[in-house]
Amino acid sequence: MNTDDFDYELDEKFIAQTPLDKRDESKLMVMDRFNGNTEIKKFYNIIDYLNPGDVLVCNNTRVIPARLFGHRPEKEEKIEVLLLQQTEDKWECLVKPGKKMKLNQVIEFSDSVSAKVVDITEDGSRILKFEYEGIFEERLDELGNMPLPPYIKEKLNDKERYQTVYSKHNGSAAAPTAGLHFTNELLEKIKDKGIYVVFLTLHVGLGTFRPVKVDDVKDHHMHSEYYTISQETVDIINRQKSKGHNIIAVGTTSVRTLETVTHNNNSKLVAESGWTDIFIYPGFEFNIVDSLITNFHLPKSTLMMLVSAFSKKEYIFDAYEKAKQNDFRFFSFGDAMFINGGRNV
């Protein structure tokens, strides 16, 4: 299976640069998972496709303002740091220009925040140990910028627009973008209809933006991301699944968490925390997820491979062509797709 098989053409005009004023007024392409039939709706119409007893599974991670700018002592050249992953009191980071930041060199971000390079990983990431006054999260809020994807050139005026309304646990370097379409009001209407809304956490890493550089899909390796799923969430999903109800994953991160856990535990969903580098591409067998809410993804990306695995690659590519014909907005701030594999109970 070749990486180029997941390529498609996309004019820059389709790439959404800013979020819509109202989250749930984005367009929604509803696609039948099993026959590829499509309908075009608004996102707030998602409730019409959910039945009482169904379960909506959301990722409640919260994006940290992980992009920092500093400089070396006595130097004016700007150093950009992107926080990837925290381990105890150290952070794995992408640093630009990386070659200049050797072991034991220091980056100053402000009078009260600096960091020292204490290790360099095999792939060139830097391990930084921060020195700061007060509480690190507060300093980060003051100094950090939202780590928007490289294809978004416009400045984001409101940091909260790159967070889901239900974001709770700090730790992501990118938003789980399918969840950006939900408003609190829409979620309340969904609950009032008898649909369960449950949460898990997967902290999204920068592997989300990293291109697939190998020709053969099977040779690609994913970066590990931390996840946790509670007993309460597991109990609701297992109970409703056993009754034949539809398990709807909000976003590819929710899919990857649920399928990681079931593949780790003989197809059973259990409460656990851990790290996942699961890579889902066509041929993958899904254990738990019936339907998927997702955005429109980059050509040749691992997310394009995941949605192609979830339905049929031909259906996905046909839907993307229809999306372009109907002026859908693509990528992180773009419109949504609902791949519906549910059964009416």
UniProtKB/Swiss-Prot annotation:
Function (record text): Transfers and isomerizes the ribose moiety from AdoMet to the 7-aminomethyl group of 7-deazaguanine (preQ1-tRNA) to give epoxyqueuosine (oQ-tRNA).
Its pathway, per UniProt, is: tRNA modification; tRNA-queuosine biosynthesis
Sorted alphabetically, which keywords does the UniProt record give? Cytoplasm, Queuosine biosynthesis, S-adenosyl-L-methionine, Transferase
Q: What are the subcellular locations of this protein?
A: Cytoplasm
Q: What is its main location?
A: cytoplasm
Disulfides per UniProt: none
GO biological process terms, semicolon-separated: queuosine biosynthetic process; tRNA wobble guanine modification
Provide the catalytic activity annotation. Answer: 7-aminomethyl-7-carbaguanosine(34) in tRNA + S-adenosyl-L-methionine = epoxyqueuosine(34) in tRNA + adenine + L-methionine + 2 H(+)
EC number(s): the record gives 2.4.99.17
Enzyme class comes to transferase
What cellular-component terms does GO give this entry? cytoplasm
- Subunit: Monomer.
Protein name, entry field: S-adenosylmethionine:tRNA ribosyltransferase-isomerase
* Gene3D superfamilies in UniProt: QueA-like
The protein's matches in InterPro entries, at most eight in alphabetical order, are given as: QueA, QueA_dom1, QueA_dom2, QueA_sf
Q: Which family does it belong to?
A: Belongs to the QueA family.
Drop me one GO molecular function for this one.
S-adenosylmethionine:tRNA ribosyltransferase-isomerase activity
Q: Which gene encodes it?
A: queA
User: Does the record carry RNA-binding as a key word?
Assistant: no
